[in-house]
Regions:
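A short, hydrophobic beta-strand-centered structural micro-motif
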Residues: 35-47
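Charged, amphipathic alpha-helical segments and their flanking helix caps
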Residues: 1-26, 30-31, 45-132
Length: 132
């Protein structure tokens, strides 16, 4: 498991869904979101964790944030907003299933995101703690 390997894997999952994948922190994602139309994937690796027990270091785990988003219709068109949320939910759950098959995961937090970024986007976000 490497930093680039994880990014490449998310890129592969995005390609399987015919969605572009972009990497960056919160401020980069906000800036990029202004120019993106249609559905897409954001990925970030904001950190990791190393635990120790009485005998040795445990496996290093890394936190991976994946957002699957589309153009938000929040508070303007409920039907279109639900369509975006449904579409992106299907993609995020597919990615989650593939991630836990490929890596060991301590768990995942899935959060609905609506009307985020300056150019509003809605969809789903998953935070995975992955290790080998």
């Amino acid at each position: 498991m490497t930093f680039k390997g994880i990014l490449d894997q998310v890129g592969t999952w995005g390609a399987q869904q015919a969605l572009p994948v972009f990497f960056g922190d919160e401020s980069t994602r906000n800036r990029l979101a202004n120019d993106i139309t249609g559905d897409f994937i954001f990925v970030d690796i904001p950190g990791g964790r190393q635990d120790y027990n009485d005998y040795a270091a445990e496996a290093f785990s890394i936190t991976v944030l994946i957002q699957v988003l589309g153009t938000s219709h929040y508070e303007s068109d409920s039907s279109s907003e639900i369509d975006v949320l449904d579409r992106t939910f299907t993609v995020i759950t597919d990615i989650a299933k593939k991630a836990v098959c490929l890596y060991e995961s301590e768990g995942a937090a899935v959060v609905k995101r609506q009307n985020i970024y300056d150019s509003p986007k809605s969809g789903w976000e998953i935070t995975l703690n992955l290790s080998e």
